[in-house]
């Protein structure tokens, strides 16, 4: 049984420049797709870039057979399609992008930028996006997506997040919470760890998706 939980909130400004998409594949209800993007701040178009990247990558993944998505080689072309779509959109700037599927006891995907995906499988942490390249960003037309894949051993948990999560929670605390807590408690504890004392605000846009199998 797979459970999905997500949370996204802006940090330090009015508009959330993160985006996410998570849903089951239309051809296989047991194949779940997840995308998280973090629009580049400090210049125009970050929010639109993140939205376009997630939606175009989701559309590209839905156009693939579920079986094909369990092969790492399928994922760089999906992210390249998102890169091209963002580059072609006059309102869009630059963004990160993580995309993956959880299907048939594997997690497979690709990433570019500094958003992240963390797997907890059989009690052990695996930083799946550790080899990704921060630049060039999605929207440049030259983003380089690095694929990843891992087997899933129950109970498992996959966290997909923007850098507003891992930077302000810290990797040590993040892994500790992900290994110990489950369900909405994971997201609640990560929020608490990242919020500023007093104001309760986030220092950066905070987006996390948790997919769990038990």
Regions of interest found by a model, annotated:
Residues 1-214:
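PP2C/PPM-type serine/threonine phosphatase catalytic domain
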């Amino acid at each position: 049984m797979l459970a999905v939980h997500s949370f996204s909130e802006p940090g330090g400004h009015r508009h959330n420049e993160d985006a996410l998409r998570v849903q089951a594949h239309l051809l296989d209800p047991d194949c779940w797709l997840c995308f998280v993007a973090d629009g580049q701040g400090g210049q125009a178009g970050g929010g639109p870039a993140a939205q376009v990247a997630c939606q175009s990558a989701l559309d590209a993944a839905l156009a693939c057979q579920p079986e094909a998505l369990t092969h790492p080689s399928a994922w760089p072309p999906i992210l390249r399609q998102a890169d091209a779509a963002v580059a072609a959109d006059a309102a869009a700037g630059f963004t990160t992008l993580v995309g993956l599927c959880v299907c048939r006891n594997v997690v497979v995907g690709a990433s570019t930028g500094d958003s992240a995906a963390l797997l907890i499988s059989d009690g052990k942490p695996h930083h799946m996006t550790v080899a990704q390249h921060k630049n060039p960003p999605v929207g440049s037309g030259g983003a380089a997506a690095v694929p990843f894949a891992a087997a899933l051993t129950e109970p498992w948990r996959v966290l997909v997040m923007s850098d507003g999560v891992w930077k302000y929670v810290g990797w040590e605390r993040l892994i500790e919470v992900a290994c110990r807590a489950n369900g909405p408690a994971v997201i609640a504890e990560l929020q608490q760890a990242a919020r500023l004392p007093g104001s309760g605000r986030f220092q950066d846009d905070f987006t996390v998706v948790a997919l769990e199998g038990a």
